[in-house]
């Protein structure tokens, strides 16, 4: 009896399996032992449920961190230019492929540095995707400002072209991006809860990128110009702000941040030509829910969506959970069209 009661302090699934026979009258004739075993099982189930909920919340934070990296750049470009960039997800994909190429290059040229290839891939992915973003803004998107439908169709076409280009260059199959040893394994918090090092590293990396973005937007001339153009483009131009250059640099910054998100994604899952397609819609939801151009709103919306997604999926299924989240967002936007954190100001007609 004392042993069965003592086992109730455990949170191990194996202990739960060990106690189950003691609740059966055919296996255990003593009623007091059966009652103690039932009480111990309930305690273990509560602890295991807590571990499962914490695990789902952590997975939600991990998903939210990826959505945040994708949505940060989208919030900048959409808030500044009003452009619905359907090719933004492909910046994630290009960033992930840049990480894969850096891994291959280091394996051939400098194998002693292969363990640190994600760190080398970060600036490479940022520069590549930022360059592509600035080129797209300069050559195509700039000529479509004020024409949202044409911009939507053009960026969707660019998205399809980039996907097909990657298929032609690297094949339609997923490529293997291996985690280095220092990102493998995890830390065991509870018997049924292990936090993987790669996801913890991605969370820490997202916080660094968030601080980096905040510093750029609030402590640099580019950030001041971006905020000025976002609030009143005509007035900013009258004050001497080079709006065309600001548009190009902001588009490059947003694309570069998405490229960094691609490097993070490469450490969490498969890398393939359609990688970005799975995140573009959720990224737009983050921007709309958080408030256009609002950094704090994007953070709250990204982590909130990620946690709700991961908690609802086991309970209701992936499809029904997604539908419920969409309905909740629609109802919220009807009450607050400007999102969680709207810009405060007065409009003069």
Residue ranges and their predicted role:
Residues 144, 150, 154, 169, ...:
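Cytosolic-side transmembrane-helix boundaries in multi-pass membrane proteins
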Residues 194-271, 300:
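Helix-loop-helix "hairpin" substructures at the membrane interface of multi-pass membrane proteins
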Residues 57-101, 135, 139-150, 227, ...:
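Single transmembrane alpha-helix segments in multi-pass membrane proteins
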Residues 112-159, 165, 300-305, 336-337:
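Alpha-helical transmembrane segments within multi-pass membrane transporters and channels
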Residues 216-217, 221, 247-287, 293, ...:
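Inter-helical junctions in multi-pass inner-membrane proteins, predominant
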Residues 88-135, 315:
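Membrane-embedded helix boundary and interhelical linker motif in transport proteins
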Residues 1-12, 21, 32-45:
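Structural detector for internal amphipathic alpha-helices that build alpha-solenoid repeat scaffolds
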Residues 12-24, 47-52:
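Amphipathic alpha-helical scaffolding segments comprising HEAT/armadillo-like alpha-solenoid repeats
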């Amino acid at each position: 009896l004392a042993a069965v009661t003592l086992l109730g302090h455990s949170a191990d699934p194996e202990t739960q399996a060990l106690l189950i026979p003691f609740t059966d009258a055919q296996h255990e004739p003593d009623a007091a032992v059966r009652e103690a075993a039932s009480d111990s099982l309930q305690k273990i189930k509560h602890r295991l449920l807590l571990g499962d909920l914490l695990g789902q919340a952590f997975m939600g934070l991990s998903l939210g961190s990826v959505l945040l990296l994708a949505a940060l750049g989208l919030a900048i470009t959409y808030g500044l230019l009003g452009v619905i960039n359907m090719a933004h997800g492909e910046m994630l994909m290009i960033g992930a492929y840049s990480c894969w190429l850096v891994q291959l290059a280091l394996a051939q040229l400098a194998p002693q540095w292969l363990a640190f290839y994600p760190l080398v891939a970060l600036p490479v992915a940022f520069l590549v995707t930022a360059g592509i973003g600035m080129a797209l803004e300069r050559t195509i998107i700039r000529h479509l400002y004020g024409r949202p439908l044409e911009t939507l169709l053009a960026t969707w076409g660019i998205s399809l072209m980039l996907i097909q280009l990657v298929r032609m260059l690297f094949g339609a199959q997923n490529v293997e991006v291996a985690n280095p040893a220092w990102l493998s394994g995890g830390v065991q918090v509870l018997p049924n809860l292990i936090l993987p090092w790669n996801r913890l590293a991605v969370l820490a990396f997202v916080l660094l990128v968030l601080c980096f973005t905040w510093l750029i937007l609030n402590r640099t001339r580019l950030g001041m110009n971006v905020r000025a153009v976002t609030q009143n483009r005509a007035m900013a131009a009258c004050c001497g702000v080079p709006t065309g250059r600001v548009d190009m640099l902001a588009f490059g910054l947003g694309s570069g941040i998405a490229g960094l998100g691609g490097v993070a994604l490469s450490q969490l899952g498969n890398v393939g030509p359609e990688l970005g397609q799975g995140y573009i819609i959720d990224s737009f939801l983050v921007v709309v829910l958080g408030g256009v151009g609002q950094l704090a709103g994007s953070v709250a919306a990204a982590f909130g969506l990620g946690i709700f997604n991961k908690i609802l999926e086991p309970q209701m299924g992936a499809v029904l959970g997604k539908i419920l989240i969409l309905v909740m967002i629609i109802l919220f936007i009807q009450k607050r069209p400007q999102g969680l954190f709207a810009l405060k100001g007065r409009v003069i007609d």
